[in-house]
Design a protein with these regions (language model features):
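Active-site-adjacent bridging/hinge elements
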Residues: 362-368, 437-446
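Short, charge- and proline-biased low-complexity linear segments
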Residues: 385-394, 436-442, 464
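C-terminal structured domain segments
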Residues: 407, 430, 444-447
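Amphipathic alpha-helical binding modules
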Residues: 441-464
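Conserved oxyanion/phosphate-binding beta-strand-loop segments in alpha/beta enzyme cores
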Residues: 422-437
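Mixed-charge, polar/low-complexity N-terminal
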Residues: 4-7, 433-434, 439-440
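Cytosolic regulatory regions of ion transport systems
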Residues: 1, 5-417, 421, 426, ...
Length: 464
C-alpha cells in the first residue's frame, strides 16, 4: 500500500513538473486512446500525454499497452480521470480531455463531472467518444461554461470521411444507361457502420445525370422493419424508388433481411445484382469482414465484374498484412480497408479535421460558432453539405464554381433544386418526416416537400 501511495505521489510530481506544457489527458489506456496519443506525439513530442485508469486489471493484457505508453514519455495515473486534480496548471496552456473508454455510460458520467470541475477554466476542451442519443442530448443541454465540448461519433466520422475522400469513385464508376449513369451500391451488414452508410448514400448520391440504387443485406429477419422505424419516410412508397420528380430526392433502396453471408442463398441473391459498382462489408468482426470481402471478390470475378470493395478492419496489423495481399499467381485481391485504429484515431481526424473547418465556415453564413459546436443538428447538417458540395464540384455541376451572385438564373435554379433534393434525403435519413409545422423534438419539418412547393424565400436557402 505504501509503495502504491509513493508511486502516485511521484506520478503527480511528474505532472506538476510539466506545468507549462499542453496536456492531452485520456480517461483510459486502451487501443483507441493509444492510437490517438501516438498521432499526437508524432506531431509534437513536447506534448504531455496522460493516461488514467491504468491499474493492471489483467497484467498480461495491459502490459503491452503500458510499455507502448512509456515510449511516449506519458504519465500513467491509476485513478479515475475525475479524481485527479489537473487544475494545478498554467492557465494559458490548453488542457484537452478525451473520454474514450469502452463503457459509454461511464464516459457520459465522467463528462458531467469534468464539466462541473473545469467549467470556469479557459483553454479547456473535452472530447467525449460516444454514439449514443443520451450523449447527444447531454451535449446540447448541459452547462459548458468556458469549455469547448465535442462529441465524437466514430461510426459517423468514419463513414463521412470515407465519402469525402473516396466517394467520388461512386460517380466515376457509375454505369451508363440510356441518358443517365447508374450508381449501384451494396451494403453487407446493417450494424452501426452499415446503417450509417445506407443513410449517407441516400443523400450523397443525389446528382443530376445519375440514378442511385442501394441494396443492403443483414442476417436479422427484421432488419428492414428496424431500419424503417429509424427512417420512416426514407423507405416509404412515396419517396423510395420515385425517379419522376426532379424536385424530390431520387433513389431506390432495397433491404434484404434474413440473409447469412455463409449461406448459398446469399451468394445467389447478391450475384443477381449484376451491375454493382461499390460494396461495403461491415459485419462487426474483422475476420468475418475480411473473409466475406474476399469471397465477394471471387464471386464477382467469376462473372467478369470488378466492383470497388471496401471492408471495415479495426486491427492495424491485419490491415497491413492484407492491404497488398495477392493470390499465388500474384493477382491483387484488391480489397480496400477502412476503419483501422491508426487512420481513424489520429490528430488530423479528431482534432484538426479539414471537413469540420469547412463545415464551420459554411455554418457561419447563417449561425454563430457556438451553435455549430453545441447543437448536433447544425454540426452534422453542415458536414453533410460540405461533403456533397465537393461532389458537385467534381461532377462539374454548372455554376458551382461561381459565387451565387455571379450565376445565371438557370444555374441558380438547377443548383437550388439539386441541393433541396439532397437536403430532403438527408433529413429523411436523420429520421425526419413531413409536417405543416417544424418540431425538431418530433423530427418533423415543413420544408420536406418537392422543390416547387417551397416558398420563394425557402428556395433561396438552397443556394449552395
Amino acid at each position: 500500500v505504501v509503495l502504491s501511495i509513493l508511486k502516485n505521489i511521484f506520478t503527480y510530481q511528474k505532472y506538476l513538473l510539466n506545468y507549462n506544457s499542453e496536456v492531452y489527458i485520456f480517461s483510459e489506456l486502451n487501443e483507441k486512446s493509444l492510437a490517438l496519443a501516438n498521432s499526437l506525439y508524432a506531431k509534437n513530442p513536447k506534448r504531455l500525454i496522460v493516461f488514467n485508469d491504468t491499474f493492471e486489471k489483467n497484467e498480461e493484457e495491459t502490459y503491452e499497452l503500458i510499455e507502448k505508453a512509456k515510449k511516449l514519455n506519458s504519465i500513467c495515473f491509476k485513478q479515475d480521470i475525475t479524481t485527479v486534480n489537473f487544475n494545478v496548471h498554467n492557465k494559458k496552456k490548453k488542457i484537452l480531455f478525451f473520454l474514450i473508454g469502452h463503457d459509454d455510460t461511464e464516459n457520459i458520467e465522467q463528462c458531467v463531472t469534468l464539466l462541473d470541475t473545469y467549467k470556469n477554466r479557459d483553454n479547456t476542451h473535452i472530447y467525449i467518444f460516444s454514439n449514443s442519443l443520451e450523449s447527444e442530448f447531454m451535449l446540447s443541454s448541459c452547462d459548458k461554461g468556458k469549455i469547448k465540448l465535442r462529441r465524437i461519433n466514430d461510426t459517423e466520422t468514419l463513414i463521412f470521411r470515407n465519402l469525402y475522400n473516396e466517394g467520388y469513385r461512386l460517380f466515376e464508376n457509375a454505369v451508363p444507361i440510356e441518358n443517365v449513369k447508374k450508381i449501384t451500391a451494396v451494403i453487407v451488414g446493417m450494424g452501426n457502420y452499415g446503417q450509417e452508410m445506407i443513410k449517407a448514400l441516400s443523400w450523397f448520391c443525389q446528382m443530376d445525370g445519375y440514378k442511385s440504387y442501394i441494396y443492403s443485406f443483414d442476417r436479422k429477419i427484421n432488419a428492414e422493419v428496424e431500419f424503417k422505424s429509424l427512417c420512416p419516410e426514407l423507405l416509404d412508397d412515396e419517396h423510395n424508388g420515385n425517379f419522376e420528380d426532379d424536385g424530390e430526392s431520387q433513389y431506390s433502396l432495397n433491404i434484404f433481411s434474413g440473409y447469412d453471408v455463409n449461406d448459398e442463398s446469399f451468394d445467389e441473391k447478391i450475384l443477381s445484382i449484376n451491375d454493382a459498382s461499390y460494396i461495403l462489408v461491415a459485419l462487426g468482426n474483422d475476420e468475418l469482414n475480411i473473409k466475406t470481402a474476399y469471397k465477394l471478390r471471387r464471386l464477382y470475378e467469376k462473372k467478369g465484374l470488378h466492383p470497388q470493395i471496401q471492408t471495415v478492419v479495426y486491427n492495424n496489423k491485419k490491415k497491413k498484412a492484407i492491404i497488398n495481399a495477392t493470390n499465388f499467381k500474384g493477382q491483387k485481391l484488391d480489397v480496400e480497408i477502412i476503419g483501422d485504429l491508426e487512420s481513424s484515431y489520429s490528430e488530423d481526424v479528431i482534432l484538426e479535421s479539414d471537413i469540420e473547418t469547412l463545415a464551420l465556415e459554411r455554418h457561419k453564413k447563417w449561425g454563430d460558432e457556438e451553435s455549430f459546436w453545441n447543437y448536433e443538428y447544425n454540426y452534422r447538417s453542415s458536414i453533410a453539405s460540405v461533403i456533397h458540395r465537393k461532389m458537385k464540384i467534381l461532377c462539374k455541376m454548372p455554376g458551382i464554381d461561381k459565387p451565387v451572385d455571379k450565376r445565371s438564373e438557370q444555374e441558380k435554379s438547377v443548383l437550388r433544386k439539386l441541393e433541396h433534393r439532397r437536403w430532403n434525403a438527408y433529413m429523411r435519413a436523420e429520421g425526419y418526416s413531413y409536417s405543416e409545422i417544424r418540431d425538431d423534438l418530433a423530427k418533423v419539418h415543413n420544408c420536406l416537400v418537392t422543390f416547387d412547393d417551397l416558398s420563394e424565400k425557402d428556395k433561396l436557402k438552397d443556394d449552395d
